Amino acid sequence: MDAPVTLITGTRIGIGRHLAEHYLRLGHRVVGCSRNPVDWTRDGYKHYGADVADEKAVKAMFSEIRRSYGRLDHLINNAGIASMNHSLLTPTSTVNAILATNVVGTFLLSREAAKLMKRKKYGRIVNFSSVAVPLKLAGEAAYVASKSAVVALTHVLAREFAEYGITVNCVGPGPLATNLIRSVPKQKIDRLLEQQAIPRMGTFDDVANTVDFFLRPESGFVTGQTIYLGGV
């Protein structure tokens, strides 16, 4: 059986890079993308420079995937941005950028992936939300709105793609050691952790374990679901 082809967005650093290396170790053929160049490479890994909110770039990337592999088994919509500001201090340009990457990007990648996946009547799509949604975190209005939209999008795409053997699920990580939260005051992180049933920082492996579950062929009866990590 051919090794599965897995596309992961936002693979330059952080969770995305960890997931890319994780699935390479598991024998996947991994395709990654990011707006900026990566400073790493691995056997079996192919990287594209693409903004997930740029429809032309996304379509070009999928044309290359189709030519190179003829298939796509998994899509992990990891790419995301945040801006932690009070709403009164957040410019519209920031809101538009967050929505473009987190919502439009997730939609575009999912749409194009489903076109390729439906040929084989099989596919797994995993989106990324955040515990910021159920916790309704103040100071992150645009980010929370975008990640709420991802949850809603997951529900609808799960229904639309089910007839093609494609499942669509979502993982909502809590605080992780990424660039997104390094500028957040420790007191705010501590208050957030206190609201979790398991009051600790998450790890990249915690995220990978959840994504593993959603990607398994045996998870074919699970779709439209969001798992928030840490117990919120």
Regions found by a protein language model. Give the residues of each.
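Active-site loop immediately N-terminal to the catalytic Tyr-X3-Lys motif
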Residues: 88, 135-141, 163-164, 199, ...
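Alpha-helical segment proximal to the catalytic Tyr-Lys
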Residues: 115, 159-163, 220
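Active-site helix of classical SDR
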Residues: 110, 146, 154
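Conserved glycine-rich cofactor-binding loop
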Residues: 12-13
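C-terminal substrate-recognition "lid" of short-chain dehydrogenase/reductases
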Residues: 107-110, 122, 200-229
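Substrate-binding pocket helix/loop in short-chain dehydrogenase/reductase
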Residues: 86-87, 91-99, 181, 192
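Residue(s) in the substrate-gating loop at a strand-loop-helix junction
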Residues: 130
